[in-house]
Amino acid sequence: VPDHVVFMNTRGEFQFSIKSYGYPLLDSGGEFLYSINTDLSGLKRIDREGQILWSLTFPVPLTTAALAGEESVIGLMDGRLLLVGAEGEVIYEQEAGGSRIPVILGTAITEDRQQIALFSGIDPQSLSILQRRDNEFVSEVTLDLDSDFRREVDLSFTPDARFLYFEVEEGLGVLDIRKKTTAGILSPGVLRSLDAATDFSAAAFRTERGSNLLIFRPLSSVLLSRQLAVPDVFLRIIDNSLILGIDGFLLRADLAER
């Protein structure tokens, strides 16, 4: 866990630094900073001066989190899903069911905060899309899965909220939410990082020889596949720039289709 969190722009220029309170999380717009306690017992929201705006504690460990502006979706070990508002208030709560162990393993929320994706349970596991209706959420899609993950699972909506990427064994699943159909993108290794943008998406998989970096679009062929000699790659997409964290360095690649 770092002592401080350092902010830089996409040109690699230093912006500011604040004290770290745990595992830092930044929303997709780069405006709101959160911190997960190192023992997974709580969540804090922090301003740009490093002051704690609010703090929540949980009776069981936090297992997954997703951010959209000033709202955050929290998954807990006991199978509860919480939607937390701008002031740290719980504005919606749901319990996962249908599994022997009702744990929340993954979640995602759309940029407009109208849909939540939920990967839950052990024996069996399921993937659900929840649609916002006023102050409630109703189930839009539910998939029964044959996976057996015992850790956090990566999920990511595309910016238009039509597709959801979800982790599968050696690759990615692609859910077309409108048609309620699924497809797959194959890759060796274990998914380590995933992000989706308007024009393309990117994923990095840890393999025996390093990493496999994929650039792709939903329901189409892979645009780019590259083997990297490092085992762990962090990535984010900002506009049409791919930001890579490799061996303590931040790299920026501007992508253009020829």
Indicate residue ranges for each PLM-predicted region.
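Post-signal peptide N-terminal segment of secreted/secretory-pathway proteins
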Residues: 1-31
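Structural motif
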Residues: 2-8, 40-44, 79-84, 124-130, ...
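Solvent-exposed strand-loop boundary residues in beta-sheet-rich modules
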Residues: 11, 49, 78, 87, ...
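Hydrophilic extracytoplasmic domains
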Residues: 163-258
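Repeated scaffold domains used in trafficking and secretory/extracellular systems
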Residues: 19-31, 57-70, 101-109, 147-156, ...
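Solenoidal tandem-repeat scaffolds enriched in leucines and small polar residues
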Residues: 55, 61-140
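Hydrophobic beta-strand positions that form the internal "hydrophobic ladder"
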Residues: 32-34, 72, 115-116, 164, ...
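A short beta-strand motif characteristic of beta-propeller blades
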Residues: 10-19, 50-57, 90-98, 138-146, ...
